[in-house]
Amino acid sequence: MRPLTIIGPTGTGKSDSAIEIADRLSSKIAVEIVNADAYQLYRGMDIGTGKVPLAQRRGIPHHQLDVLDVTETATVAGYQRSAAADIEAIASRGALPLLVGGSMLYVQSLLDDWAFPAKDPAIRARWERRLAQVGPARLHADLVRRDPAAAAVIPLNDARRTVRALEVVEITGRPYAASAPRIGSPRWDSAIIGLDCETKVLDERLAARTKAMFDRGLIEEVISLLPCGLARGVTASRALGYAQVMEALKAGADTQALDRARQQTCLATRRYVRRQRSWFRRDRRVRWLDATVSTAAHRTAIIEAVLGAWRRAS
């Protein structure tokens, strides 16, 4: 069964659309949803990640949700292996795999079947020691000397990617970009649909979404996860909303600190949306649909358009 993929920026209604599509098809074919959001992999991280509550999933099987503890590190390679196995198992059952999410690397690694460069723990440890000694700016300067093209696209403060680039350059003897995958025919010949909407409208949705998360108990959720090791988690601790709330709690959790956390979460989400758009828009395989209007009639029209595109592609 040819998979269907729904991608797009945060706040465009991907998860709700996926459930509606699965529900619409349920009388004809079974549908199983595969998550492609890095932070929805974590158990207990529900409110801040926009995870659809179990009661609202309409009995539709979901995969790649709640598979990691907050202390475990999520990796693109690990996700790729697990999600690919899920998709192939779903298809083997004669069901439709429906991939949904906005984590750019996760989506592309899966659809383009990325081959990841080898790792060398000793080399990585040496660059990590160098990072600890000189800091991210000096380490980035090392990358500028060894691979200017990689340094040009890796932010100065992104120490993890800088370390990885230096590791790959040393292992392969080639520029980091030489190991980067290219966009080709999507794996499993998946149909790819993108949802987006006007920036002004999406910014308003993100503000409302952030407020709703805090109103629903994001602060309490973060507090409940701290004894589980949230602050120690390499990946989980960086999640939007969670990182900001932890900073507010450190600052005393007064009204001013928590208001600042909410504002910073909204601003950080808007910045993330810009990066999502930039990444996804370069993929010419995507058929984009406008999700600006949120009336019931327009949502129905979007579902029909998605299904039509999938049927034509199939």
Curated annotation (Swiss-Prot):
Name assigned to this protein: tRNA dimethylallyltransferase 2
EC number: 2.5.1.75
Phylogenetic classification of the source organism: Bacteria, Bacillati, Actinomycetota, Actinomycetes, Mycobacteriales
Function, in words: Catalyzes the transfer of a dimethylallyl group onto the adenine at position 37 in tRNAs that read codons beginning with uridine, leading to the formation of N6-(dimethylallyl)adenosine (i(6)A).
Entry keyword set: ATP-binding, Magnesium, Nucleotide-binding, Transferase, tRNA processing
Site (Interaction with substrate tRNA): S103, R124
Self-association and partners: Monomer.
Gene name of the record: miaA2
Reaction catalysed by this enzyme: adenosine(37) in tRNA + dimethylallyl diphosphate = N(6)-dimethylallyladenosine(37) in tRNA + diphosphate
Biological process per Gene Ontology, one example term: tRNA modification
Sites where the protein binds ATP: G8, P9, T10, G11, T12, G13, K14, S15
Family (UniProt): Belongs to the IPP transferase family.
